[in-house]
Amino acid sequence: MDSNTVSSFQVDCFLWHVRKQVVDQELGDAPFLDRLRRDQKSLRGRGSTLDLDIEAATRVGKQIVERILKEESDEALKMTMASAPASRYLTDMTIEELSRDWFMLMPKQKVEGPLCIRIDQAIMDKNIMLKANFSVIFDRLETLILLRAFTEEGAIVGEISPLPSLPGHTIEDVKNAIGVLIGGLEWNDNTVRVSKTLQRFAWRSSNENGRPPLTPKQKRKMARTIRSKVRRDKMAD
């Protein structure tokens, strides 16, 4: 096992512990608490993959951080903070929408890279809006926290979430997963729109109906689907 992988996990465990203390003292806001919960799931997945105990890793991580801080000068810390780009946390969903439990009548689950897509295939002929909470850096989506699909009545019918065991994803991973989710929902004659916030930072462009532009891969898949449907209709006639 790579030593850098282990030490990175140990430091992440300790930093999560520090952030948990901030929340326990009621010093964290809603986005801070949201990230804490998501990172907890990620650490559990990484710990299982690496076969490392989180409590023991936290203690070692503390020693690593203390050693670094002891060697770090105030001037170097100021320079690091000044040169680091700042990310922003954007929310389409409320805390209630983000944390609400939901179930599927006809569940379908697919893994697309480091992201998990869940769709309720029982949903038909609905107007659906995709909302997401995510971080942005350089005016581009950086990290997806959670994306959910809502009907006009407020029911959750789909979801995209990072896999705890595979931390890290790109904007292309997110766009591909959204394409899969939209395709699955539209297959049952649902009309799907994407929130303006997500359109802006994931695509920087969109159709007037709120649907993001299709990638070449999605266009080819849609063309095959249409041809297949036309053939079935002709056979039925």
UniProtKB/Swiss-Prot annotation:
> Where found in the cell?
Host nucleus; Host cytoplasm
Q: Which family does it belong to?
A: Belongs to the influenza A viruses NS1 family.
**Domain of life (superkingdom):** Viruses
Q: Which UniProt keywords apply?
A: Eukaryotic host gene expression shutoff by virus, Host cytoplasm, Host gene expression shutoff by virus, Host mRNA suppression by virus, Host nucleus, Host-virus interaction, Inhibition of host innate immune response by virus, Inhibition of host interferon signaling pathway by virus, Inhibition of host PKR by virus, Inhibition of host pre-mRNA processing by virus, Inhibition of host RIG-I by virus, Inhibition of host RLR pathway by virus, Interferon antiviral system evasion, RNA-binding, Ubl conjugation, Viral immunoevasion
- The main location class comes to host cell
Domain notes per entry: The dsRNA-binding region is required for suppression of RNA silencing.
- What's its job? Inhibits post-transcriptional processing of cellular pre-mRNA, by binding and inhibiting two cellular proteins that are required for the 3'-end processing of cellular pre-mRNAs: the 30 kDa cleavage and polyadenylation specificity factor/CPSF4 and the poly(A)-binding protein 2/PABPN1. In turn, unprocessed 3' end pre-mRNAs accumulate in the host nucleus and are no longer exported to the cytoplasm. Cellular protein synthesis is thereby shut off very early after virus infection.
Specify the protein name: Non-structural protein 1
Please give the residue ranges the record annotates as the region PABPN1-binding: 223-230
Q: Where is the composition biased (Basic residues)?
A: 217-237
Q: Could you give a single Gene Ontology term from the biological process aspect?
A: symbiont-mediated suppression of host PKR/eIFalpha signaling
Pfam families, alphabetized: Flu_NS1
Task: Map out region (RNA-binding and homodimerization) in residue numbers.
Answer: 1-73
- How does the record describe the protein's post-translational processing? Upon interferon induction, ISGylated via host HERC5; this results in the impairment of NS1 interaction with RNA targets due to its inability to form homodimers and to interact with host EIF2AK2/PKR.
Q: How does it assemble?
A: Homodimer. Interacts with host TRIM25 (via coiled coil); this interaction specifically inhibits TRIM25 multimerization and TRIM25-mediated RIGI CARD ubiquitination. Interacts with human EIF2AK2/PKR, CPSF4, IVNS1ABP and PABPN1.
This protein's record includes keyword RNA-binding: yes
The molecular function terms in GO held by this entry are:
protein serine/threonine kinase inhibitor activity; RNA binding
Location of the region described as Disordered in the Swiss-Prot/TrEMBL record: 205-237
According to the record, the residues making up region (CPSF4-binding) are 180-215
- Annotated InterPro entries: NS1, NS1A, NS1A_effect_dom-like_sf, uS15_NS1_RNA-bd_sf
The short sequence motif called Nuclear localization signal sits at: 34-38
Q: Where is this motif: Nuclear export signal?
A: 137-146
Gene Ontology cellular component annotations, sorted alphabetically: host cell cytoplasm; host cell nucleus
